[in-house]
Amino acid sequence: MDWAEKYRPRHLNEMVGNREALHQMSEWATRWTVESPPLILYGKPGIGKTSSAWALAHDMNWEVVELNASDQRTKAVIEKVAGGSASTGSLTGAARKLIILDEADNLQGNADRGGARAIAEVIRQARQPLILIANDLYGLDGTIRNLCTKVQFKALPAKSLVPRLREICSREQLTCSAQALTDIAEQSGGDIRSAVTMLYASAIGKDTVGEDDVSISAKDSRASIFDLVAATLGYRQVPSLLDMSMSVDETPDTILQWIEGNLGVLPDRKKTAQAYAALSRADMYLGYTFLTQYYTLWRYATSVMLYGVHDVMKGRPSGYAKIMPPSRWRQMSVAKKQKTIREQLLSDMGTSMHMSASTVRNLYLCPISLLAKQFPEQFAKSYDLDVDKLDILIHDPATSKSIIKKIEDEKKQIEKELKKKKKEEDAKGKKARGSKKEKEPIVEETPSIDSFSSQEPGNPPEQPSTEPVEKDKKSSQSTLFSF
């Protein structure tokens, strides 16, 4: 059995590091109510996010329903699995049911179409604890981030990994040198899962593990696009920008857009022009690549863009700048989201008005918007609009938020009153049944057949009159031919 799974922590007090995050999770679980927002656990892979969620469920005696990247996560699947689980109780007798959505930032392509929207809807309607797990916090939809409490998991320092590795060696009766454990901890990059896997790979078929036995190459150390852009702009020193670009899981055209989107830090126009000249030349190579399908040109494009911009940045005072995704992407994302919301709104209104969405768009959208501005609350209630859909009609985000919040508060208040009324009715019914039971007269038991059979043959008991009974029997057994 793989040691990473064999020695997975079962309780929060067995977790290594991230004490602040674990304390935050424990406090959230202890004080959880239906109104509590879900948690987002985010950080590098392998630092204990999923294990801590399972350990929390074990400590709280909660049942677990998990949906990860290996499952299909379309809107229908999420609403069926997570949505149904989040709104119903446990069938196993557990106190509650914890919904874990692992790799929530990996909803991509047609396979996970509509998943992000479904997650947001599940969060709003959840009646059970919900935890989302992500490697990249900003890979999640903004709506989901705003609905959740964020808990950051940080990479573990090497010195905190060594005691855990030593404990595993002791349980496996394995002799391992201190230097070998230190090497494994340092090479893991704060990834405890990788460290345990490296120890397991080094110990296969051995009773003793030394420095020469350690499989240092077991961890694939990859750079992120943020590291590459920071190195290109001169914020960090690396041996080779080209080698670093090979370890980044992005294509050259994407790297070019990242660099271009962060050129606002350049000090003067002359240097800005020089940097854009390098990017322009690289873009020409990319164009030739797609035109000829000769992908060897990618290497030239990458070299020109990286070293061209890096050379311009020489002599600039070193410091720190926040590396951001290209602003164009954010604008495109907002436009795409607005278009999706608009099309959904038109479709819903067309269905309620018995006409097509295109007819609503071409003929009725303007008068509908005018009416919605005059009666926004009535429109929101009639068509069950959320903040985004109402904002499409009235073009006032602040008013839309206040109106939807007011409607949601009214719904919650009505729901509380109904629950309170139901509890009072149940209590009155229980009290009435109890008083009725006390007032019922004690009915003497009718002698049974066994009591007659227990009498002696010589002394037959005095039998009550059975004439009415016989009459009742005859009347109940009467047929069409009875006279």
From Swiss-Prot:
One GO process term, biological-process aspect: DNA replication
**Keywords carried by this UniProt record:** ATP-binding, DNA replication, Nucleotide-binding
Q: Name one Pfam family in it.
A: RCF1-5-like_lid
Binding residues for ATP = 43-50
CDD domains documented for this protein: AAA (cd00009), HLD_clamp_RFC (cd18140)
User: In Gene Ontology terms, what is one molecular function of this protein?
Assistant: DNA clamp loader activity
Which residues lie in Polar residues bias regions? 448-457
Q: Basic and acidic residues composition bias: which ranges?
A: 417-442
Region (Disordered) location: 417-483
**Family, per the entry?**
Belongs to the activator 1 small subunits family. RfcL subfamily.
State the PANTHER family in the record. Answer: CHROMOSOME TRANSMISSION FIDELITY FACTOR 18, REPLICATION FACTOR C SUBUNIT 1
How is the subunit organization of this protein annotated in UniProt?
Heteromultimer composed of small subunits (RfcS) and large subunits (RfcL).
HAMAP family named in the record: RfcL
UniProt function note: Part of the RFC clamp loader complex which loads the PCNA sliding clamp onto DNA.
Any idea what this protein is called?
A: Replication factor C large subunit
